[in-house]
């Protein structure tokens, strides 16, 4: 479920040495499966461990994950790096914004996962997002843009050079193209 590097394990062990015996670390996701999902790590006193928490043993400490966060922390990794300018703890959780789907899930679910987990985080930096409305019988993904993407003058570049290229590479036998059905209205909300 969660990989914690040796350096991060050592860091947590040092931090937990100053806490009451039995204190764990809790790894969690706030707003799991949503575009605004946030991951975090906190101390978890022994009396805060819930019966349905998943307990993960590591070198000298345990990590706990609540049942609501667990599916969204699949393939998560925590690392700790010391650099000249200081140290940094990183938590990468590729499934925090969208629950990972099985390889044999329906095509629309697999495409939706790629959109939520990989494409929308990039569009969010411009205040935008894209949603899939359907996939036609001939393999065309029908998309609708919102936020800063609605009315953006660069939408054709984003659609063809970004999203279509990614989906064709990921699903070469199933997706044949993309089509934008957004009623684009340029305004102050538009990125460009």
Curated annotation (Swiss-Prot):
Cofactor note: Binds 1 [4Fe-4S] cluster per subunit. The cluster is presumably bound at the interface of two monomers.
GO molecular function: 4 iron, 4 sulfur cluster binding; iron ion binding
InterPro entries (UniProt xref): Fe/S_biogenesis_protein_NfuA, FeS_biogenesis, FSCA_dom_sf, HesB-like_dom_sf, NIF_FeS_clus_asmbl_NifU_C
Record: residues binding [4Fe-4S] cluster: 149, 152
SUPFAM superfamilies: Fe-S cluster assembly (FSCA) domain-like, HesB-like domain
Cofactor: [4Fe-4S] cluster
Keyword vocabulary terms for this entry: 4Fe-4S, Iron, Iron-sulfur, Metal-binding
Any one Pfam family match given in the protein's UniProt record, by short name: NifU
GO annotation (BP), single: iron-sulfur cluster assembly
Subunit structure: Homodimer.
NCBIfam families: PRK11190.1, YhgI_GntY
Membership in a protein family: Belongs to the NfuA family.
Function description: Involved in iron-sulfur cluster biogenesis. Binds a 4Fe-4S cluster, can transfer this cluster to apoproteins, and thereby intervenes in the maturation of Fe/S proteins. Could also act as a scaffold/chaperone for damaged Fe/S proteins.
Protein name, as recorded: Fe/S biogenesis protein NfuA
Species the sequence originates in: Idiomarina loihiensis (strain ATCC BAA-735 / DSM 15497 / L2-TR)
Name of the gene this protein is made from: nfuA
